[in-house]
Amino acid sequence: MQQSQSRSLVDWLSYLEQIHPANIDMGLERVGTVARRMGLTELPFKVITVAGTNGKGSSCAMAASILMAAGYRVGVYSSPHLLRFTERVRVNGQELDDGDHCAAFTEVEAARGDIALTFFEFATLAGLWLFRRAAPDVLLLEVGLGGGSMPPMWWSPTSP
């Protein structure tokens, strides 16, 4: 992508839909390689992975409310979004702005090199980059369909 820093969020999202031939491509190798390049292998906060067939969003919302009431700064990564892409990354209930997401996409794009990332992989890496900058005490990381083979699982304590 040319002039990636001057792209709007809409432009970035359109681009992300085109850079991988499949919507879903199971495996953690691509995410792991780019995460290492971005320095995202060791996150400076606790990560709670939320997985399961149903209720992940509700579980994240409830856990976030409890943790915030206890005085913690809480990040929540969820997918898919309902209305706006920025819903996927929230800190203490607040979405980050389009410019923050564009900056994160620029970082992922620079780190990925010739690795073709799916939309979800790219978005997850961008989200983790944003959370590292936002410095929550705890991150609730929702895992999508596919469970252990999905990008957020790379940061699970049982992953590589």
Give the ranges of each region predicted by the language model:
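A conserved segment at the C-terminal end of the G1
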Residues: 46-50, 58-75
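ATP-dependent carboxylate-amine ligase
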Residues: 1-7
